[in-house]
Amino acid sequence: MNKGKYIFLDVDGVLNHHETYKKKHVNSLYPDLDPECLALFSKLVHSIDYVHIVLSSSWRLIESDMDRLEAAFKEFGIPKWIDITPYLEYEQGKTRGKEINQWLKENHVRKDQIIILDDNTDMADLKNRLIQTDFMNGGFKEVHLKKALHMLKGNHMTKETKEIFEALEAANNTLDNLYKALNALDSAKSWSIADILGGGFLMTYMKRSRVKEAQVYIDNRKASIEKFAKELHDVNEDINISLDTGEFIKFADYFFDGILVDWYVQSNITTAQTQVSNAISRVEHIKELLLHKLNGASVQ
């Protein structure tokens, strides 16, 4: 069993994420798994010859969980895992990394033959083989796929390559907040128009709710853009994005009622939409530059 490449697979935070549970009705066959994550994982396993899956997730401990996972794998053309990692008791110093190390020892597999897909970091001396995903931010994404392919093909992870992957992950986090903000603003604008046309209390409430939601995502993007800028600095890129939407969007028409204030709020929602859309375009362009840089090409 010591030939080929091995993927040690966690499930929660890799093949699903916190948004998955809001969409359970979409697919009742595997409501705890995300179709987009499964599709990307399928792409990964079919892009590498002689690759094997070893299940390291806590799902391996519950038969019904494994049955659901196997059914989802079958639908997405993913081969079933060849084995599961051993379960270590807490008195044995149980960590995910130690369980994987135990499996490697028992099966005579080298560390450079493996990658680990997991949202946890308790990997002991295997952290350099970890591709860490994020349960709160989409699980297994395109950037993780690219990193996994890079490692499984035996490419050396240089400092520059590592920094590019980190910048790409930061770009994805930033885009996630920006797209959520834009969706909330789009909804707020629709409710705002209805409110101006005399929609009543419900329309006003829904408008305010969506504006508040957008403000949360806009506030969140501040931290993600700061991290993105830092990662870009590490790869000699630059970014300059301004999203000054202002607190007035939150509360202006809470205390004042009238057509002038309603139009003022509507105007500022439109301004915020434009700012967020421009920021998305800028980040998407920089992401494209990073991907070309990763592939050894350049974009003017």
Predicted segments, located by residue:
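Alpha-helical coiled-coil oligomerization motifs
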Residues: 176-179, 183-186, 190-193, 197, ...
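A short acidic (Asp/Glu
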Residues: 18-20, 64-69, 125-128, 206-207
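C-terminal cap/substrate-recognition subdomain and adjoining C-terminal extension
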Residues: 67-156
